[in-house]
Amino acid sequence: MTQLLERAGTGSTVLHATSRPWASALFQGRRHIIVLALEGVDASTRADRFADGIEEAQWNLNRHFVADITIDDQRPTDNGVQIELAALTIEDW
């Protein structure tokens, strides 16, 4: 979460986060859904920067790696922008 908030910038908070187990025939990991609130006059610009290249971003996780990450929804709010993203993390053997 810390890395996501750093990427989103000052004035960003986690509104909601869920995580559930995920497995395939060869791998196991977790599926995450995270909703971020970006607030402030520059929220729209920060949201665009946050989303730009997120699929190729490098994440430092202990014993896991990010196999997939996507922005599922991005919408304006009264105070800024709300972003919903999904990520799949896989155990790194």
Task: Write out the residue ranges for each language-model feature.
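Long, contiguous binding/interaction regions
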Residues: 1-93
